[in-house]
Amino acid sequence: MKIAVTADPHLNNNSYHIQDSDSGLYIKSIDAIRAFEWFGDEAINRKVDRIVVVGDVYHHPDTTELIRTRLNKVLQKLAGEGIQVVIMAGNHDFCSRYHALQSLVGWNKHIKILDKPFVETGVATYVPHTMDIECERTDFREVIKGLPTADSKNHVFFGHFAVRGALRDNLSREESGNAVSATDIEGTGATVAFLGHFHKYQRIKGNIPIFYTGSIENHRMDDMDGKRGFFIYDTDTGEYERVDYENCRPMHSIEVEDFDSAMLILRDGDWESSIVRLSAVGEHSDYLDIRNKMMELKRLFSAAGGAYIFCRDKTAAVDPKGSKIEIESIEKINVLETLKAEIDERIPDDEECSLTKDLLEEVHAEEKSK
């Protein structure tokens, strides 16, 4: 049996909060659903017998009807070709004891929704993000150790959780002592494992091949350097292959010293459909200058076909030579910096943290101009 494996589609991804004027969807949602539609077509073209989605079909459980409709069209197309579909619940699919995949349960005989561990004798072990883990904080290691050991020659393991040593989405390493280890997965008797949860395509060190398949479409800036695609695994031969996706939206992170260097870079680049993050690394006064002139940068960027551009502060907190800061009252500076520090504490996701601070800066600038 040939199985096509993907993970973390996040079909209603709202990163950057940029809406398409025609559909009203966020553009990263459009990117995600297009990638999933491509995955479905590739599964059909490569004549697989089954697809497995290893969690996080959605970015959050409250999604739009348009996203559901496009997902259903992919599932109908696969069912029409006689391809089985197994969808595992991920942590982003859940809201307490409810998960957004429940509307698909019983929808078609070709589709199976898994929200609790399941061992398919002679084929595979599935460990989704479960209701118990969502509501009762059951340990994944306990769940895995309680599963029956596989006895088939080419037994595949699918799981949606963190594994020790894996690269997280923020590029740090998963070092938690409670995280599942490669040894835990090997103890199930599996001969290969495909995982979801972290979005980077990576192989975990161990005695069997253990992969995070990675999401097909980039989710955020930190994803952009990695390869994108999905796996095909043959349970008869134990062989697997990687199929690459070449149509990710361009995303660029660029360091700039000041406004003039930002203008120069934007004039010379190809920004068609791109999302660009400028990181101000000069003096803090230069960052403030960029922020004050951001509309000029946005007009230039938009004229070049760009989708979205924003700037983050990577300068020192205070510029002793910057007249703009010295003009401000110390109370206002302290309030702004205090709020930014609070945002750093409360929002663990780097990209969301940066965007929230950017919004705070914009609101602060607007209030000052009144």
Regions found by a protein language model. Give the residues of each.
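Glycine-rich phosphate-binding loop signature in dinucleotide/nucleotide-binding domains
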Residues: A43-K47, T149-K153, G269-W271
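Accessory, non-catalytic peripheral segments of nucleic-acid enzymes
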Residues: T235-K370
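N-terminal active-site segment of His-dependent metallophosphoesterases
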Residues: M1-T69, D350, S354, K370
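Short acidic, S/G/P-rich loop/turn micro-motifs used as interaction or catalytic elements
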Residues: Y58, D132-E134, E283-L288
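His/Asp/Glu-rich metal-coordinating catalytic cores
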Residues: R50, P61-F211, S215-N218
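A generic secondary-structure signal
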Residues: W38-R46, V74-K77, G146, I265
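A conserved active-site cap/scaffold subdomain adjacent to cofactor or substrate pockets
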Residues: V192, G196-F259
